[in-house]
Design a protein with these regions (language model features):
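Conserved, structured C-terminal
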Residues: 1-133
Length: 133
């Protein structure tokens, strides 16, 4: 789901990049240029409750009926009991949490639009309780 064209910030991994301090790493200068700018795209998760829908990746993401991206991966999430997909949602004015949650989403699966639920937190154990048990 992450390619050389995606930043850790867009992929939701900004917490894993040590930007404070002077620790050198490959790509630091490029990340410093975009670190404080609004994100134009963001990796998010979706679930589709229609059991007949099969997510494979490359399905179009619709927000309020407008195409805003596509899934980079999809499949059935056995631990969550639902169809799961991840993809980048794009918007020229930025993709803040408020903008993301204000929309209604659907995925184009085999030519038909299926309602989708946006997931900004991990689908399985979102509070990390199992890992701390």
């Amino acid at each position: 789901d992450i390619t050389p064209n995606d930043t850790p910030f867009e992929a939701g991994l900004g917490w894993a990049v040590k930007m404070k301090g002077d620790t050198p790493f490959i790509g630091r200068a490029a990340l410093e240029q975009v670190a404080n700018q609004p994100l134009k795209k963001r990796l998010v998760g979706f679930t589709v409750s229609d059991s007949a829908a099969v997510l494979l990746g490359r399905e179009t993401i619709l927000r309020n009926g407008e195409s805003v991206g596509y899934l980079t991966s999809g499949g059935y999430g056995f631990t969550v009991g639902n169809n799961v997909g991840f993809g980048y949602v794009r918007h020229d004015n930025g993709v803040s949490d408020d903008w993301l949650t204000a929309g209604q989403y659907a995925l184009i699966i085999a030519g038909d639009a299926h309602p989708a639920k946006l997931c900004l937190r991990p689908l399985y154990d979102p509070d990390g309780l199992r890992i701390r048990a």
